[in-house]
Amino acid sequence: MGSIKDWNGRDPREAQDIKKRWQEYTEELYKKDLHDPDNHNGVITHLEPDILEWEVKWVLESMTKNKANGGDGIPVELFQILKDDAVKVLHSICQQIWKAQQWSQDWKRSVFIPIPKKGNAKECSNYHTIALISHASKVMLKILQARLQQYVNRELSDVQAGFRKGRGTRDQIANIHWIIDKARESQKSIYFCFIDYAKAFDCVNHN
Protein backbone atom coordinates (compact mmCIF):
# COMPACT_ATOMS: atom_id res chain seq x y z
CA MET A 1 0.00 0.00 0.00
CA GLY A 2 1.66 3.23 -1.17
CA SER A 3 2.14 6.28 1.01
CA ILE A 4 -0.29 9.19 0.58
CA LYS A 5 -0.81 12.48 2.37
CA ASP A 6 -3.48 13.02 5.01
CA TRP A 7 -5.67 16.13 5.39
CA ASN A 8 -2.81 17.97 7.11
CA GLY A 9 -0.25 17.17 4.44
CA ARG A 10 1.53 14.60 6.60
CA ASP A 11 2.65 11.20 5.32
CA PRO A 12 1.03 8.41 7.35
CA ARG A 13 3.33 5.41 7.67
CA GLU A 14 1.19 2.75 9.26
CA ALA A 15 -1.03 0.67 6.97
CA GLN A 16 -4.00 1.31 9.25
CA ASP A 17 -3.52 5.09 8.98
CA ILE A 18 -3.24 4.91 5.20
CA LYS A 19 -6.40 2.82 5.06
CA LYS A 20 -8.17 5.34 7.28
CA ARG A 21 -7.09 8.19 4.97
CA TRP A 22 -8.54 6.40 1.95
CA GLN A 23 -11.74 5.79 3.85
CA GLU A 24 -12.02 9.49 4.72
CA TYR A 25 -11.35 10.47 1.12
CA THR A 26 -13.91 8.14 -0.44
CA GLU A 27 -16.58 9.04 2.13
CA GLU A 28 -16.06 12.72 1.35
CA LEU A 29 -15.98 12.04 -2.39
CA TYR A 30 -19.33 10.26 -2.46
CA LYS A 31 -21.07 12.39 0.14
CA LYS A 32 -24.21 13.98 -1.28
CA ASP A 33 -23.82 17.75 -1.45
CA LEU A 34 -26.26 18.85 -4.14
CA HIS A 35 -28.25 22.04 -3.83
CA ASP A 36 -30.69 21.47 -6.66
CA PRO A 37 -33.98 19.92 -5.51
CA ASP A 38 -34.81 16.51 -6.94
CA ASN A 39 -37.01 16.82 -10.00
CA HIS A 40 -39.42 13.91 -10.32
CA ASN A 41 -41.54 15.43 -13.08
CA GLY A 42 -42.24 12.92 -15.79
CA VAL A 43 -41.07 9.94 -13.75
CA ILE A 44 -42.49 6.66 -15.01
CA THR A 45 -44.72 5.33 -12.26
CA HIS A 46 -46.22 2.17 -13.75
CA LEU A 47 -44.69 -1.03 -12.42
CA GLU A 48 -42.28 -3.20 -14.34
CA PRO A 49 -42.88 -6.96 -14.44
CA ASP A 50 -41.16 -9.25 -11.96
CA ILE A 51 -37.58 -10.32 -12.53
CA LEU A 52 -37.64 -13.20 -15.00
CA GLU A 53 -35.41 -16.28 -15.07
CA TRP A 54 -34.44 -15.72 -18.68
CA GLU A 55 -33.10 -12.27 -17.74
CA VAL A 56 -30.81 -13.81 -15.11
CA LYS A 57 -29.66 -16.48 -17.57
CA TRP A 58 -29.05 -13.89 -20.28
CA VAL A 59 -26.89 -11.77 -17.94
CA LEU A 60 -24.82 -14.73 -16.71
CA GLU A 61 -24.13 -15.89 -20.26
CA SER A 62 -23.08 -12.40 -21.34
CA MET A 63 -20.75 -11.67 -18.40
CA THR A 64 -17.05 -11.59 -19.23
CA LYS A 65 -14.77 -14.19 -17.66
CA ASN A 66 -11.50 -13.53 -15.80
CA LYS A 67 -12.85 -10.41 -14.11
CA ALA A 68 -11.77 -9.36 -10.61
CA ASN A 69 -14.03 -10.59 -7.83
CA GLY A 70 -15.93 -8.42 -5.41
CA GLY A 71 -15.86 -8.59 -1.63
CA ASP A 72 -17.49 -12.04 -1.53
CA GLY A 73 -14.64 -13.57 -3.55
CA ILE A 74 -17.01 -15.51 -5.82
CA PRO A 75 -15.82 -15.63 -9.46
CA VAL A 76 -18.32 -15.29 -12.27
CA GLU A 77 -17.02 -18.58 -13.70
CA LEU A 78 -18.58 -20.43 -10.75
CA PHE A 79 -22.05 -19.15 -11.64
CA GLN A 80 -21.50 -20.05 -15.28
CA ILE A 81 -20.39 -23.59 -14.40
CA LEU A 82 -23.44 -24.12 -12.16
CA LYS A 83 -25.68 -22.94 -15.02
CA ASP A 84 -29.38 -23.54 -14.24
CA ASP A 85 -28.74 -24.08 -10.51
CA ALA A 86 -27.09 -20.66 -10.30
CA VAL A 87 -29.88 -19.12 -12.36
CA LYS A 88 -32.55 -20.40 -9.98
CA VAL A 89 -30.73 -19.19 -6.84
CA LEU A 90 -29.88 -15.76 -8.26
CA HIS A 91 -33.36 -15.37 -9.69
CA SER A 92 -34.86 -16.02 -6.25
CA ILE A 93 -32.55 -13.43 -4.64
CA CYS A 94 -33.18 -10.83 -7.35
CA GLN A 95 -36.92 -11.37 -7.07
CA GLN A 96 -36.81 -10.88 -3.28
CA ILE A 97 -34.91 -7.61 -3.75
CA TRP A 98 -37.38 -6.50 -6.42
CA LYS A 99 -40.39 -7.21 -4.25
CA ALA A 100 -38.92 -5.73 -1.05
CA GLN A 101 -37.38 -2.75 -2.90
CA GLN A 102 -34.41 -3.13 -0.58
CA TRP A 103 -30.90 -3.86 -1.80
CA SER A 104 -29.02 -6.68 -0.07
CA GLN A 105 -26.52 -5.46 2.53
CA ASP A 106 -23.92 -7.93 1.24
CA TRP A 107 -24.33 -6.53 -2.24
CA LYS A 108 -23.73 -3.00 -1.01
CA ARG A 109 -20.17 -3.87 -0.03
CA SER A 110 -17.43 -3.15 -2.54
CA VAL A 111 -13.65 -3.20 -2.65
CA PHE A 112 -12.05 0.10 -3.66
CA ILE A 113 -8.91 -0.13 -5.79
CA PRO A 114 -7.01 3.17 -6.29
CA ILE A 115 -5.52 3.44 -9.79
CA PRO A 116 -2.91 6.25 -10.11
CA LYS A 117 -3.39 9.02 -12.66
CA LYS A 118 -0.87 11.65 -13.70
CA GLY A 119 0.36 13.96 -11.00
CA ASN A 120 1.46 13.68 -7.40
CA ALA A 121 1.03 10.06 -6.31
CA LYS A 122 0.73 11.17 -2.68
CA GLU A 123 -2.57 12.96 -3.33
CA CYS A 124 -5.70 10.81 -3.15
CA SER A 125 -7.36 13.03 -5.74
CA ASN A 126 -4.81 11.87 -8.32
CA TYR A 127 -6.23 8.36 -8.31
CA HIS A 128 -9.17 6.72 -10.02
CA THR A 129 -11.16 4.90 -7.34
CA ILE A 130 -12.41 1.69 -8.93
CA ALA A 131 -15.06 -0.22 -6.97
CA LEU A 132 -15.12 -4.00 -7.29
CA ILE A 133 -18.63 -5.26 -6.61
CA SER A 134 -19.81 -8.85 -6.37
CA HIS A 135 -20.73 -10.63 -9.59
CA ALA A 136 -24.03 -11.65 -8.01
CA SER A 137 -25.01 -8.00 -7.57
CA LYS A 138 -23.95 -7.28 -11.16
CA VAL A 139 -26.65 -9.67 -12.34
CA MET A 140 -29.38 -7.53 -10.79
CA LEU A 141 -27.69 -4.31 -11.89
CA LYS A 142 -27.45 -5.44 -15.52
CA ILE A 143 -31.11 -6.46 -15.54
CA LEU A 144 -32.09 -3.02 -14.24
CA GLN A 145 -29.76 -1.35 -16.72
CA ALA A 146 -31.29 -3.22 -19.66
CA ARG A 147 -34.80 -2.29 -18.55
CA LEU A 148 -33.94 1.36 -18.03
CA GLN A 149 -32.06 1.61 -21.30
CA GLN A 150 -35.22 1.40 -23.39
CA TYR A 151 -36.63 4.47 -21.62
CA VAL A 152 -33.37 6.41 -21.51
CA ASN A 153 -32.75 6.10 -25.24
CA ARG A 154 -36.10 7.72 -25.95
CA GLU A 155 -35.37 10.63 -23.61
CA LEU A 156 -31.78 11.44 -24.60
CA SER A 157 -31.11 14.11 -27.18
CA ASP A 158 -30.05 12.98 -30.64
CA VAL A 159 -26.92 15.11 -30.34
CA GLN A 160 -25.62 13.10 -27.37
CA ALA A 161 -23.11 10.49 -28.49
CA GLY A 162 -21.25 9.67 -25.27
CA PHE A 163 -22.37 6.74 -23.12
CA ARG A 164 -24.70 5.41 -25.79
CA LYS A 165 -24.59 2.02 -27.43
CA GLY A 166 -23.13 2.11 -30.92
CA ARG A 167 -22.01 5.73 -30.56
CA GLY A 168 -19.11 7.51 -28.91
CA THR A 169 -16.78 10.49 -28.87
CA ARG A 170 -15.60 9.56 -32.37
CA ASP A 171 -19.01 10.70 -33.65
CA GLN A 172 -18.57 14.11 -32.04
CA ILE A 173 -15.02 14.38 -33.36
CA ALA A 174 -16.36 13.73 -36.85
CA ASN A 175 -19.00 16.43 -36.31
CA ILE A 176 -16.33 18.91 -35.21
CA HIS A 177 -14.27 18.17 -38.34
CA TRP A 178 -17.36 18.73 -40.48
CA ILE A 179 -18.11 22.06 -38.76
CA ILE A 180 -14.51 23.23 -39.18
CA ASP A 181 -14.50 22.32 -42.88
CA LYS A 182 -17.76 24.20 -43.45
CA ALA A 183 -16.47 27.23 -41.56
CA ARG A 184 -13.33 27.30 -43.68
CA GLU A 185 -15.35 27.08 -46.88
CA SER A 186 -17.45 30.08 -45.87
CA GLN A 187 -14.48 31.85 -44.19
CA LYS A 188 -16.30 32.22 -40.89
CA SER A 189 -14.88 32.16 -37.37
CA ILE A 190 -16.03 29.46 -34.99
CA TYR A 191 -15.54 28.97 -31.27
CA PHE A 192 -15.53 25.71 -29.34
CA CYS A 193 -16.00 25.39 -25.61
CA PHE A 194 -14.82 22.17 -23.98
CA ILE A 195 -15.86 21.52 -20.38
CA ASP A 196 -14.26 18.80 -18.28
CA TYR A 197 -16.17 18.32 -15.03
CA ALA A 198 -13.93 17.26 -12.15
CA LYS A 199 -15.09 14.00 -10.57
CA ALA A 200 -18.19 14.04 -12.76
CA PHE A 201 -19.09 10.39 -12.17
CA ASP A 202 -18.44 10.63 -8.44
CA CYS A 203 -20.75 13.62 -7.99
CA VAL A 204 -23.89 12.01 -9.41
CA ASN A 205 -26.76 11.83 -6.94
CA HIS A 206 -27.73 8.15 -6.93
CA ASN A 207 -30.65 8.50 -4.51
Language model features with spans:
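Conserved catalytic palm subdomain of right-hand nucleotidyl-transferase polymerases, strongest
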Residues: S3, M63-I74, K122-L132, R170-N207
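Surface-exposed loop/turn segments and immediately adjacent short secondary-structure elements
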Residues: M1-N126, A131, H135-V139
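Active-site-proximal segment of RNA-dependent polymerases
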Residues: L34-W58, Q102, W107-V111, Q150-C203
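Extended, charged alpha/beta regions that create polyanion-binding interfaces
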Residues: L144
